[in-house]
């Protein structure tokens, strides 16, 4: 049985969730040296941002998973997407390393909710005979996100548009794209 338009849209949204997660992670990796320079620390000091982002995902998976079970996956997923988009972009405005790390920890909580909510909503929405293929499609979002981050970083980082040079802070503003939809 072919998928309906709504089912295909759910698959695309799930795929994009995984892709944007990987995009954010890789943008952080690419920009570590510039962030470290701006905050006057060594790269290992700023690499702690990777740790707190990943460590807090467990918390987010629990919180958003419970909320999704209680109030429905779709509305909680929308709340989650807005949360991680705003928190990801807020890192662009962090005036200190401490605030940057706190924002990355909160972003990790929100991002932790995306995988469980997006995957379960997708799998519940599609025909059972499509679940193997669709789970592979969802997982291919991760390398797609890495590829997109490489392209965005390669094309836009340190480029000047309208007299403004796009540094590491601008890279985090791309986090707003999911919420814009």
Residue ranges and their predicted role:
Residues 1-181:
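Transmembrane-helix signature of 12-pass secondary carriers
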């Amino acid at each position: 049985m072919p998928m309906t338009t709504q089912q295909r849209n759910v698959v695309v949204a799930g795929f994009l969730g995984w892709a944007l997660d990987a995009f954010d992670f890789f943008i952080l990796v690419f920009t570590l040296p510039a962030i470290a320079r701006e905050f006057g620390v060594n790269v290992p000091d700023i690499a702690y941002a990777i740790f707190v982002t990943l460590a807090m995902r467990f918390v987010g998976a629990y919180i958003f998973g419970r909320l999704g079970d209680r109030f429905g996956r779709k509305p909680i997923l929308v709340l989650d997407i807005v949360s991680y988009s705003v928190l990801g972009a807020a890192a662009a405005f962090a005036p200190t390393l401490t605030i940057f790390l706190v924002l990355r920890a909160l972003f990790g909580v929100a991002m932790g909710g995306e995988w469980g909510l997006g995957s379960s909503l997708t799998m519940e929405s599609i025909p059972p005979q499509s679940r193997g293929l669709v789970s592979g499609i969802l997982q291919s979002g991760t390398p797609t996100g890495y590829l997109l981050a490489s392209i965005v970083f390669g094309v836009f980082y340190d480029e000047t548009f309208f007299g403004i040079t796009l540094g590491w802070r601008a890279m985090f503003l791309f986090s707003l794209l999911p919420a814009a939809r």
